[in-house]
Amino acid sequence: QLTLRGSFYPSGKGYYAEHSDLNGGELILDIIPLSIVKEDYESGGLAIRSKQNKLINIEHKMRHGSVCYLKNSVNHKIQLIDKKKRFNKNLHIGRFSLISTTPKKINS
């Protein structure tokens, strides 16, 4: 079964360390942005590790309606959202997205 969850990375505080999803039971991860860099927050966001071992931020490529598909073996992270801004728990500013996963084995 597909799993759907929302994520929020607040401005000035939100990030997620680099990882792959090889051991998580997912085959494919798809990420649907609900906020857009330079519109809803200034910097940071989704970055992937290339085959040449280079970290590439792909957030600026995404628009409303985009879907980013990642194989479970691709290393990725969320770079700190708005690292030059101070975190304010009363503001809901930052990076929002929906994430769904396709399991490696689908029971029928």
Predicted feature locations:
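Conserved double-stranded beta-helix
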Residues: 1-39
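Catalytic core of Fe(II)/2-oxoglutarate
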Residues: 37, 41-108
